[in-house]
């Protein structure tokens, strides 16, 4: 038979361990990761060759990444139904025009299944005039797209130098990285 005190202490220990495992042991208010907003940027330095592709554009022309050779390119993977993508696109439009004369280009890659019927009115509504292409399964896999929006910065030599996952909501986050590679 169990003694009542032993059962009581066992129960208290179990409850305490459960609370600690759920809430953690430390004060998370000083932990930067605990303060990161849900749509915060995830950026990574990359040094690998960007896979070339040939994708259909909104003008119904085949466009390849190699046609941007010698430029710094920001590939923006997005969809019309993605709210954070809608926040980023006007920022990318500004960046495209701000740095175009310095050899920079934004290339949007839509993952929408409806393609032209949905994408064309969407980009007209946002006044987007940088090139928009339609993703295929291969480019989606080669660039390891796991979230939208995802932006991939490619340097003049065709190397992937930076990757942004999620919406930064801030032009400055992109400016710092773009200017580094111009």
Model-derived segments and their meaning:
Residues 1-52, 173-176:
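N-terminal targeting signals for export/organelle localization
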Residues 34-36, 153-182:
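Thiol-/selenol-based redox modules, centered on thioredoxin-like
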Residues 46-47, 52-73, 99:
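A short beta-strand-turn-helix
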Residues 69-71, 101, 128-129, 145:
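Active-site acidic short loop of glycosyltransferases
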Residues 71-73, 77-81, 88, 147:
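Short pre-active-site segment immediately N-terminal to redox-active cysteine/selenocysteine motifs
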Residues 87-126, 135-142:
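Structural microenvironment flanking redox-active thiols in thiol-disulfide oxidoreductases
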Residues 120-157, 165:
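Short, internal strand/loop/helix patches
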């Amino acid at each position: 038979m169990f003694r009542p005190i032993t059962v009581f202490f066992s129960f208290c220990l179990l409850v305490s361990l459960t609370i600690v495992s759920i809430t953690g042991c430390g004060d998370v208010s000083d932990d930067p990761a605990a303060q990161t907003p849900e749509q915060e940027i995830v950026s990574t330095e990359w040094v690998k060759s960007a896979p070339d592709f040939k994708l259909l554009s909104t003008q119904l022309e085949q466009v390849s990444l190699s046609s941007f050779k010698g430029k710094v390119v920001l590939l923006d993977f997005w969809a019309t139904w993605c709210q954070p993508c809608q926040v980023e696109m006007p920022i990318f439009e500004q960046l495209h025009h701000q740095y175009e004369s310095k050899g920079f280009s934004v290339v949007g890659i839509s993952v929408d299944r409806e393609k032209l019927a949905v994408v064309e009115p969407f980009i007209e509504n946002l006044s987007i005039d940088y090139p928009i292409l339609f993703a295929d399964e291969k480019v989606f896999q080669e660039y390891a797209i796991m979230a939208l929006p995802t932006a991939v910065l490619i340097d003049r030599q065709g190397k992937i130098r930076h990757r942004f996952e999620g919406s930064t909501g801030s032009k400055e986050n992109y400016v710092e990285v773009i200017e580094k590679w111009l």
